[in-house]
Amino acid sequence: MTVTNRLVPPAVDGRPTQEMLQLAIDLADDARAFVRPRFRSRVSIEQKPDGTPVTEVDTALEARLRNRIRARFPKHGVVGEEGGGQRANADWVWVLDPIDGTQSFILGKPTFASLIGLMHRGVPMLGIIEHPALGDRWVGVAGSPTFFNGEPARVRACAHVAEAALSTTGPNWFAQDELAAFDRVRAAAKVQHWGGDCHAFGLLASGFIDLVIESSHHLHDFCALVPVIEGAGGVMTDWAGDALGSDSGPRVIAAGDRRVHAEALALLGEGKSW
């Protein structure tokens, strides 16, 4: 896929250049081509120290993407879920999650994605949610509209939690006090759905979901999501309502409407300072 002018805002210091966006799209194309033939095949699986699984596809894909970044922008930093950080204090840092939703990938569920993010001085500025098995792709750049499969994506209006469709990966990702806070929002929501991995954030950007609330999120989990959500007209913060950046985590909330975001934050924060 080639970058078009509508994807790139006018040149402003601190915003990604057309060359950076083109590389991000090339990385997403590479991820799709690499992962698709390996999906629902027999792959080696190991357990990381934190108990989560990692496959040979995760590690091999991240290595491929890192090599392409280093070849094109040798002064940029790279932070990845599997390979850690290199030049992590650089002004421009790429943030990679080669397979977000590894368990779904292992189980043959197509909701996993490759997340490609780019930060400038700790602020997420570019993000791609690439779903190789589904053929879905959201592209967000600071200062520019979000695109889904080449067409503009837009959140929907939703003023109140009582009118909202709420999504989260699952209850096991919350600590006990976090789950109690989440349950207050869940009890008030019109619809609540478990599962979906990062696909839920893309669906929020396209106006199908109103709220996504998660915990146990690291930089590689949320960096690419922020520009996608914001470029579609939504808002994504931590549970205190603060902007997300390189030092944020682990609790995140995304909303398509600032009004429902404010209501959900109030419910999450009852009797608790996050």
Segments (PLM) and residue ranges:
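N-terminal subdomain of lithium-sensitive/metallo-dependent phosphomonoesterases centered on the IMPase/IPPase/PAP
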Residues: M1-I99, A266, W274
